Swiss-Prot record:
Statement: the UniProt record of this protein carries the keyword Nucleotide-binding: yes
Sites where the protein binds ATP: G28, P29, I30, N31, S32, G33, K34, T35
Protein name, as recorded: Uncharacterized ATP-binding protein PYRAB12000
GO molecular-function terms, A-Z: ATP binding
UniProtKB keywords: ATP-binding, Nucleotide-binding
Pfam families: ATPase_2, MJ1010-like_2nd
InterPro entries: Archaeal_ATPase_domain, ATPase_dom, MJ1010-like_2nd, P-loop_NTPase, WH-like_DNA-bd_sf
Source organism (scientific name): Pyrococcus abyssi (strain GE5 / Orsay)
Family assignment from sequence similarity: Belongs to the archaeal ATPase family.
Amino acid sequence: MFFDREKELEELTDLVSSKPSMITFTYGPINSGKTTLLIEFSKRLPREYIVFNINLRGRFIREEKDFIKVLFMKKEESESIKNSYKGIPIPEGILNEILENPFLFLEEYFEEINNSGRIPVLILDELQVIGDLRIDDLLIYKLFNFFVRLTKELHLAHVFVATSDSLFLERVHGEAMLHGRSRFMLVDDFDERTTLEFLTSNGLSEEEAKIAWHYLGGKPSYLVDLLQRSRIRVEDYCKEALKWRTSQILDSLYTLKGRKLRKVIELLSKFRENDEITYGPLSEEIVWSVRNNILFADPRERKLRPQGRLEKHAIELALEKLRNNF
């Protein structure tokens, strides 16, 4: 369900209106609407653009060959050129040939599209799933080198990479090979005004919308799920969501012991009084809290905060329960 991302859409449209020159990383807290935004962006592009939107979420990728196969899709012989694809269309039977040098094939393919007067837009969603694959060297570095060649060197295609994994993004942000060759675009949860507009425009009363904002904040996935549970009172839904999220955080905390547990509790306790804090080097407690989707780290701003408003409430309740249990 798409709603009021005109500012972000305008920014994305501005990026593709000029010659390709940088890789654009779209990032943000979990479930903040990055995928939905990029799909809507793809739909709105004029016919001069051809979009290749490849989502790696849920794909079983164990080695480089698996990733390359995900990039491509079988092309029917009679199929005409479309505006949008979920993979790079190739004739049946040539995949093994492409596996020998996939990046050369893609470069020549995008060059062919350019020569026809159209502009390729490559979107890779949830790219972090290949972050640690090693074949000769890290696949991710091969891929970044290729993206730099497509954008900065050859100006053949616009490249967008989306991720909710802020540890992966931290690694990318500090990567020397991408300095001056990449930009970062935050896709955040809705603010209060947008949240209230979204909920009231979809049937909730102003009072119900304010209750939802108090508990859930502006995370689109939570709000959409709330709207789909129309038979449940808004406050009941919100309290149940908070109970469930608190239990999830407690389950994660119960796996820790000793010094690490104390350090994580010390970190999370800072959010009783603060919505966000600054951070320096990534400590083990920050890495753990981010990896368990409790906190969101923004490497561009060096800010650390709960993944959302619901998570902030759940952190407070989880810490209270821990104090009562020990």
